[in-house]
Amino acid sequence: MKNIKKAIISMIAIVGLSTNVNAFEGLSVGAAYSSLDFSTSGSEVARGAEGGGAMTVNKTTKTGSGDIGSIFAEYSFAQGSTIGIDYISGSTEIGKASRTEAGTTSGTVTASAAISNPMTFYVEPTYMVNDVFGVYVKTGATSITVQPKEVADAGNVVTSTYKDKDIWGIMTGVGAKYYVGNFFVKAEYLETEFQTYTHTSTTGDK
């Protein structure tokens, strides 16, 4: 998997634990709605029937989009800058491709990959234009679990087994926020580029 481009349309939170110095300073918790566009690329070096045949290289690139929700907690300083953590529960498929096995065993093998439970740690250096409106840059690190899987349409076709693996990505973006009483709204554009997942399967594929 190569990268995920993430555009957050809106984010609403309830601000708590504010101080008398600045009504926006303190701990905030809330929920976010995100509209995602992602692109993934992958390749597999297959060793043929039961791991003993000639090696072949299968490559694919996939793009997609989706809408997700997340929860977050963050702390804002009196100047307006913020540190926080964002968490998404669940999993989603990010790519699928098929190949045809021939020889002593024949059939179609479908490989897919899913990601689950993304968690992002972030900072938002902020410039407050006035008392209620600010703009910021955002950067952070995101951890996700990659879950590859292979299935075959025939019982005599040997499939590979891959391990789930946690990988990290670097997130960057820009945004703006607006405060209304003890509430605030954010609009952001973010991009995250992840590490490459690599693994040698139980049959020698990788």
Regions found by a protein language model. Give the residues of each.
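Surface-exposed strand-loop-strand hairpins of Gram-negative outer-membrane beta-barrel proteins
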Residues: L36-I68, S160-W168
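Residues that define the transmembrane beta-barrel architecture of outer-membrane proteins
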Residues: M55, S65-G69, I115-M119, D166-T172, ...
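Predominantly the C-terminal beta-signal and adjacent terminal strand-loop region
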Residues: T92-I94, T172, Y178-K206
